[in-house]
Amino acid sequence: MFAIFEVGSKQYKVQKGDVIYVEKQDKKVGESISFDKVLMVDATIGKPYIKNATVSCKVEKQGKQKKIFIIKHKRYTRSLKRQGHRQPYTKLVVTGINVK
């Protein structure tokens, strides 16, 4: 059984036991979280979401991605601006797909 659900502005296709990385969620490690914006379960398609369907997940890790560097350079003036950014994420393990 698979499901497609929405977190923030992104959609994820998952099965039970899958590990996904989503935008930062305000939950502690070990807590469970459930998402109700389920777009599709197997052959059932929602309009836009399926009522009474949830995807349950367990928070495995809160972390930050690898640092990316932004460099802005202006020619002729020897000016250079460097900036770094690390995007926070939440690592989730799918524990169940529930349809009532």
UniProtKB/Swiss-Prot annotation:
GO (cellular component) term, any one: cytoplasm
InterPro entries linked: bL21-like, bL21-like_sf, Ribosomal_bL21
GO biological process, one term: translation
Keyword Ribonucleoprotein: yes
SUPFAM superfamilies attached to this UniProt entry: L21p-like
Cited Pfam families: Ribosomal_L21p (PF00829)
Single annotated GO MF: rRNA binding
Keywords associated with the record: Ribonucleoprotein, Ribosomal protein, RNA-binding, rRNA-binding
Keyword Ribonucleoprotein: yes
NCBIfam families: L21 (TIGR00061)
Family stated for the protein in its record: Belongs to the bacterial ribosomal protein bL21 family.
Subunit structure: Part of the 50S ribosomal subunit. Contacts protein L20.
HAMAP family, per database record: Ribosomal_bL21
Protein task: This protein binds to 23S rRNA in the presence of protein L20.
Name used for this protein in its record: Large ribosomal subunit protein bL21
Species of origin: Malacoplasma penetrans (strain HF-2) (Mycoplasma penetrans)
Gene this protein is translated from: rplU
